Regions:
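Conserved class I S-adenosyl-L-methionine
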Residues: 1-53, 68, 72, 174
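C-terminal alpha-helical "lid/dimerization" subdomain adjacent to the S-adenosyl-L-methionine
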Residues: 12, 28-32, 157-214
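A generic alpha-to-beta junction signature in SAM-dependent methyltransferases
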Residues: 51-53, 136, 150
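Short glycine-centered segments of the SAM/dcSAM-binding site in methyltransferase folds
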Residues: 58, 153-155
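Class I SAM-dependent methyltransferase SAM/SAH-binding core
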Residues: 58-116
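A short acidic, Gly/Pro-enriched loop at the edge of an enzyme's catalytic core
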Residues: 115-126
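A short SAM/SAH-binding and catalytic strip from SAM-dependent methyltransferases
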Residues: 126-138
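A short glycine-rich, Lys/Arg-flanked "PGG" loop and its adjoining helix->strand segment in the class I
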Residues: 140-152
Length: 219
């Protein structure tokens, strides 16, 4: 029986709530506003960048979770979509979502630890990590690996719950850590500094409630 809460890698029931909220915009937008004070449209806008990649491009989605970012991938787009996650259960959910969306032939599953990605340096044109960095045990090594596999001129994009978005959301952060849904997390300033140290200068960060959306280009 699935537990209601716990680490995302264990596929708790709460992970399904996250996926459902993204796939049902009308109620999802309301839920995101109430829980984390965030505009769900920012996620949809960020995911849409995947659909603008040309044929032959490679995108890494880590952690892919239930496959919510697949909504940006177009059938017949001709890209290689590497779906990486430390949980086989999450990979299975992503593959099921890919089949429903008619994009399964573009998706390559990879059972992997974000701190040691099995990809060559500079092999990805786009790296996305939506609602991922706040789940990792240590976000700093994850940032280093995401930047390592990104090619020069490639884009990194994602979202996370940040530690410095105000006291209003401290209850969300504390509860998330208590039930093992959230890891160490980091501040927006730390995220910018870490990516800059890894060759991604001028990371753009947009704050929406407890969430921070980020996008940068590797030098």
């Amino acid at each position: 029986m699935r537990a209601p809460v716990g680490p995302w890698a264990d596929d708790p029931l709460w992970a399904g709530v996250y996926d459902w909220s993204v796939e049902h915009p009308r109620l999802g937008r309301l839920g995101w506003r109430l829980v984390v004070g965030s505009n769900l449209s920012l996620l949809y806008d960020a995911v849409a960048e995947i659909g603008r990649l040309p044929a032959g491009a490679a995108v890494l989605d880590v952690p892919c979770g239930g496959g919510v970012a697949l909504r940006g991938l177009r059938p017949g787009q001709g890209v290689t979509y590497i779906a990486a996650d430390i949980s086989q259960a999450m990979l299975d959910k992503t593959l099921a979502a890919a089949r429903r969306r008619g994009v399964a032939e573009q998706v390559v599953p990879s059972l992997a630890d974000v701190a040691a990605l099995p990809l060559a340096d500079g092999s990805a044109d786009l790296v996305v990590s939506f609602a991922g960095l706040h789940c990792f045990p240590a976000p700093r090594p994850a940032v280093a690996e995401m930047a390592r596999v990104l090619r020069s001129g490639g884009v990194v994009s994602g979202s996370m719950i940040a530690t410095d978005t105000g006291a209003r959301y401290e209850g969300v952060r504390r509860l998330g850590r208590r039930v093992n849904m959230l890891g160490d997390m980091c501040s927006r300033a730390e995220l910018v500094a870490w990516f800059a140290a890894e060759g991604v200068p001028d990371l753009r960060v947009t704050t929406s409630g407890a969430m921070a959306y980020f996008r940068g280009v590797k030098a």
